[in-house]
Amino acid sequence: MRRPQSNKDKSNTPGKRKEYTKKPFSKGRVATSSKKTNPAPSDPDLIRLNRYVANAGVCSRREADTYITAGNVTVNGKTITEMGHKVKLTDIVKFDGRLLNPQKKEYVLLNKPKNFITTTSDERGRRTVMELVSKASKSRLVPVGRLDKNTTGLLLFTNDGDLAKKLTHPRHGIRKIYHVELNKNLSGEDLKKIQEGITLDDGPIKVDEVSYINNSPKREVGIEIHSGRNRIVRRIFEHLGYDVKKLDRVIFAGLTKKDLPRGHWR
């Protein structure tokens, strides 16, 4: 029985052996081999500098490229501005003079309570969300996006700069759902206005979805939105004459608060 001809066999032996003829070349023309050479194996101990910086939680890889070309990064005391430069994990890499440590990527989910601001530090001495996750990791974590002081609910922390950038950019359409409690019932007319889109001081805004919450008073509303504009949910309702009494983020990027009490993290 004849062995079936593989694709490799077909491409290399299409009926008869291919003959190669030597072509003449003159000065300035280099003879090239018809054989393909395998690329040298990459060194597993080397990583791109932009990835190193991103893994240290400073920023995304794209942003790291900008900082590198601007001269913000040094390797073993030498300023590196070359795109694609590679480093070893044992190299001494600094960003604006601060020593970086390429960490394992970590993610912490917090159910934020009220009266904490979303920032890594505050000059005015106000309580920050970092207090709540101080024991969650030894890595330098940063909050992904923000919740204002009086907003509760899901807040993600990570040292993964690329993921943080992706989750905060509106073009990626990251799903965020809020439970809103107003000072009075939301009228059907105003509900329709929100569904169709309204215009605020900083431009038009259209939510992904808004509806009354089942088996609850009409002053309680669920709203899904991917915009990251400052206080956007509160401003939508304030524009229509409502006061937001409670604002709770119940879903963020597919993550939920299930079995996560207020003020706790996992």
Regions found by a protein language model. Name each.
Residues 2, 15-18, 31-266:
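Basic, flexible Lys/Arg- and Gly-enriched helix-loop patches that mediate nucleic-acid binding at interfaces
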